[in-house]
Amino acid sequence: SLFYPQAEEKGLKFNTVSEGMTEELYIGDSLRLRQILLNILSNALKFTPEGGRIQFTIRQMSRGDKDAWLRFTVSDTGIGMSKVFQKHLFESFEQENPNISIKYGGTGLGLAICKNLVTLMGGSINVHSIEGVGSEFCVDVKLGLTEESYRRKNLDLLKFRDLKTLIVDDDIVTCEHASLIMSD
């Protein structure tokens, strides 16, 4: 991951977790999703002091026939933010106070852009934060399933285990081999 070396250099514990994922590939706007997640992870790195922790979690929340809802969560033990500021967090040029801008830099545009991109993707972005404790950002988006996923789901419905198969060949070894393969 792009963030492991940066986290290590800053003395942070960084880990990733994958929960409930049934697919390896999804269809969606990978460029925009990457932009959103990189921004949130960059903020977590920026606002988490040495010795802190950042966790990136991907969870499949639900799955339909042709799409699935995924939740990307970034949680940190950073500086957190006040409840009042959280209401304005996704507005352009917003930073909690001038000292934040001086100490950490930034324009206050990143999360406003993230919010717009997530909305354009038909998803949502939320934050839960406690000042002095840390923050948790959740991005929920619906992504399409690949043809392979769709076929695999439909194959599962056929329940091949209940079917009988006739294997015919003039070579007994070939028949035994085919029988072994089909029994799995």
Task: Describe each PLM feature range.
Residues 1-9, 180:
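Short alpha-helical segment within the cytosolic histidine kinase core of two-component systems
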Residues 5, 79-80:
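Glycine-rich G1-box
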Residues 9, 17, 63, 67, ...:
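Disordered, acidic interdomain junction associated with two-component signaling
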Residues 44-45:
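Short helix-loop "hinge" at the ATP-lid/N-box region of the Bergerat-fold HATPase_c
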Residues 81-95:
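Short conserved segment of the HATPase_c
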Residues 96, 105, 110, 114:
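Short alpha-helical Gxxx[C/S/T] motif in the catalytic ATP-binding
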Residues 122-128:
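Glycine-rich ATP-binding loops of the HATPase_c
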